[in-house]
Amino acid sequence: LDALRWVESIGGSNELVKISNENLKIVEEWVNKSKWIKFMCEDKNLRSATSITLSIKDEWFNKFNEEKQRETVKKIVSMLKKEDVANDINGYAKAPPSLRIWGGSTVQNDDMKALMPWVDWAYHSVKNNA
């Protein structure tokens, strides 16, 4: 019942969808400016607004074998967790090495905006210290 009250308090199910779609838009804008990351699903019409999956397109990363790529992603994820800015954003275990960001309505748009520079920071920190 608390969850239903919360949904009502923010404006109903339409608002939930709006928040999630805006989170995806925030990530899209960030990806479009990035030189190192892309959407795993390249077809914009098929992308999930809740489970946003990203793959690394940087040549530096893609020269590694899959094991080294997973290790690199794990370092990025670990740095973000240590800074307490993101938890559990590693891609699915059976998916190619990737990041998976929850974009559902429980993540406020300002928090999603704040996350993007942190992901850049973690990636570049790992790359520059390799």
Where are these predicted regions, by residue range?
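Generic non-transmembrane alpha-helical segments
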Residues: 30-33, 75-85, 118-126
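Short glycine/proline-rich, acidic loop/turn segments that cap or connect secondary-structure elements
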Residues: 80-97
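PLP-dependent enzyme catalytic core of the Aspartate aminotransferase-like
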Residues: 93-130
